[in-house]
Amino acid sequence: MSDSHLTAFDKASKAGFIIALGIVYGDIGTSPLYTMQSLVENQGGVNQVSESFILGSISLIIWTLTLITTIKYVLIALKADNHHEGGIFSLFTLVRKMSPWLIIPAMIGGATLLSDGALTPAVTVTSAIEGLKAVPGLSHIYQNQTNVIITTLVILIVLFGIQRFGTGFIGKIFGPVMFIWFSFLGVSGFFNTLGHLEIFKAINPYYALHLLFSPENHRGIFILGSIFLATTGAEALYSDLGHVGRGNIYVSWPFVKMCIVLSYCGQAAWILANKHSGIELNPFFASVPSQLRVYLVSLATLAAIIASQALISGSFTLVSEAMRLKIFPLFRVTYPGANLGQLYIPVINWILFAVTSCTVLAFRTSAHMEAAYGLAITITMLMTTILLKYYLIKKGTRPILAHLVMAFFALVEFIFFLASAIKFMHGGYAVVILALAIVFVMFIWHAGTRIVFKYVKSLNLNDYKEQIKQLRDDVCFDLYQTNVVYLSNRMQDHMIDRSILYSILDKRPKRAQVYWFVNVQVTDEPYTAKYKVDMVGTDYMVRVNLYLGFRMPQTVPRYLRTIVQDLMESGRLPKQEQEYTITPGRDVGDFRFVLIEERVSNARQLSNFERFIMHTKASIKHVTASPMRWFGLQYSEVTLEVVPLILSDILKLPIKELVPVEDSEA
């Protein structure tokens, strides 16, 4: 990558600053909506909190944001970019060659990030709409929680419904809206603290440590489950690195952190001033003058929608990366926006909608959702820490230092995990079950791919070159197609799957002018689009290796058209002049793509466990995108052929012929 690109990635700009606010900080920026409310309610209400409890809580929030978000993610993780892309799967691609078992933390981290992300739209939008309870004139309507639920569901239906059309048209307002949001957090928080400037003593970590062991803290270490809500968006910050660049995050994070901390301090000051008032409203909304609350709710709802949109888009990207890493089933992907970064996966969109809606209906209030929120993301952070340790070692950090630094973060995050574990019985089990289901699917898909690689036989193409030439010239067979294209997951040097040669020569001899053998390899770089060609010493057999980035669409026909033109222009491939055509000068014949589906046979080579893996993978395939759609072949001529997975050493079953009685008597 050139220095100019590196500079562009690392430098900041005014426009990049605003864009970063709209894309990166939606989740962490809406945490003030519910974090203090969770702390106060779990302590027994505003009447039950003391000054030392409030100081300790704010201190815990400040130092959690500092240690996890600022130091681990902004200062360390952002340096672990894979060609300017971030996130747990990008990090995995950087270190996967260091140890084969690293696929495990990558799968677990990706699954928990997806499952917790399904809860984010529910908790943020519900929290924002519940703010209407504090608005004079509307409070009598929204005191009925059913009205809150209905309004929330309507917003979610619209939000998930517009995904298919692309969100670029509304994405332009995300940055300015979030700038107003963060500015409001900072300004309102600052004015609320003016009457209680002692709240800024919370910057001293003494108050954080004191609260953890204080008898005033009714929940003990489990208070960290609520504190962790303040930093759940840190992982999303790293995942969105590629959208805005490292420099813009470096510049925007201090502003965001200052505004968030001021908001928490302002809410804390309001609690101290009203702890004997008996008010049980959400401190976030209650700390604002009543005449401004309707505007605040509107702004909070917009911020919640933006945060939800960021999580939805992030989920699409995460699943897309997992599919191209061959650890997730293939689902149909469309690109409704103007660039490749705006993708849409219908199945994932509606699964997220179903999970989010069920969460709203099952938990009903944001307080109940908060009780379940954050458990899975602690696991994601632990998995990221494991991968980061290997990255630091790979980049030359002394192993002892890498182990010590990451052990510190792992210890902190493990404590948060233990503190959040109590959430399992308060609804966290739903998120854990969803995460386990995703991990199971990933494991089945990955293990099934490895089994296929283990058993499928390969043959040397050179050994069958003469037979293919004879078939090509044999006019006794009708021309099957001018160009026959085979897509193969496995192709190394001149070795190709036995099933492909079986299809050409045995199953039904396929006479063609040119035989294409195409292998798509996903690279660690996100936007690679390169190819390599081997003519196998002929002008009628072409081996093509397509190297596509993990964020590139694998639409093979589009790439193949370019490759054909390049080969003809260079003289390596004869022109295929057409006698009958409506396109003057057309010199490329027709194409037929042959897809070979491998199914488990009854041969005995597979163990019972391997057979379970393959049968389960086959069942999952029924609800996934067909290879035809995945490779962009829906408008091409395609033949699907089924072959058994095991093609060697099939044992003969003993059987005897029954001789007719009259023949035996003769």
UniProtKB/Swiss-Prot annotation:
It catalyses: K(+)(in) + H(+)(in) = K(+)(out) + H(+)(out). It is found in: Cell membrane. Keywords: Cell membrane, Ion transport, Membrane, Potassium, Potassium transport, Symport, Transmembrane, Transmembrane helix, Transport. InterPro entries: K+_transporter, K_trans_C, K_trans_N, Kup. Its main location: membrane. One of its GO terms (molecular function) is potassium ion transmembrane transporter activity. GO terms for cellular component: plasma membrane. The chain crosses the membrane at residues 16-36, 58-78, 100-120, 141-161, 165-185, 221-241, 253-273, 294-314, 343-363, 373-393, 399-419, 424-444. Pfam families: K_trans, K_trans_C. It is a multi-pass membrane protein. The keyword Acyltransferase does not apply. Belongs to the HAK/KUP transporter (TC 2.A.72) family. PANTHER family: K+ POTASSIUM TRANSPORTER, OSMOTIC STRESS POTASSIUM TRANSPORTER. HAMAP family: Kup. Transport of potassium into the cell. Likely operates as a K(+):H(+) symporter. This is Probable potassium transport system protein Kup.
